[in-house]
Amino acid sequence: MRIKRFEFNMFPVNCYILSDETKEAVIIDAGCFYEEEKQALKKYIDDNGLNVKHLLNTHLHLDHIFGNPFLLKEYGLKAEANQADEFWLNQADAQARMFGFQLPEPPVPLGKYVCDGDVITFGNTKLEAIHVPGHSPGSIVYYCKEENCLFSGDVLFQGSIGLSLIHISEPTRPY
């Protein structure tokens, strides 16, 4: 599996494009906010001849969904995330205002729900979805057993507990 990492937006967010030898791919957390970030993502996809099969979100906090409208327009990709986070989409404008900016485009509805235990396939690669509520009610991590690789969004941070941007985050709530 080939992994390309981008660091996007003002918060910042790690966005990943995973692909394999078949040229099929998935995008995880398309947090591209600025036009140059969107174009960098597009350039990588197009230059590598990738056929993106899934647009996955680890959760639906504002900073992780900025690029979803762009990818829907550009490639017809509908975002996939856990249903427990869907309410964040209706609060995106209020979240943006809370941080002093306006969304360039409204969020787009989810195309599919991702549940604990779902297997996402692209090419010859499989990712297992694992529901890990805490940072947000619908937090999902994506695990590739064959590569022993985990894409955790904001659930794990190196050397810290990260930043809970939204007051509804409940890092110590027992689930």
Place the predicted regions along the sequence by residue.
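Conserved beta-strand hairpin/beta-sheet module of binuclear metal-dependent hydrolase folds
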Residues: 1-48, 141-153
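Core dinuclear metal-dependent hydrolase active-site scaffold
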Residues: 3, 117-144
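Short Gly/Pro-enriched turn/cap motifs at secondary-structure boundaries
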Residues: 6-8, 103, 109-111, 131-133
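Divalent metal-coordination and catalytic microenvironments
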Residues: 18, 29, 59, 71, ...
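Active-site metal-binding loops of divalent metal-dependent hydrolases
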Residues: 30-32, 60, 83-84, 134-136, ...
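Active-site HxH/HxHxD metal-binding segment of metal-dependent hydrolases
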Residues: 33-38, 42-122
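A short acidic, helix-capping loop that chelates divalent metal ions and anchors anionic groups
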Residues: 88-92, 159-165
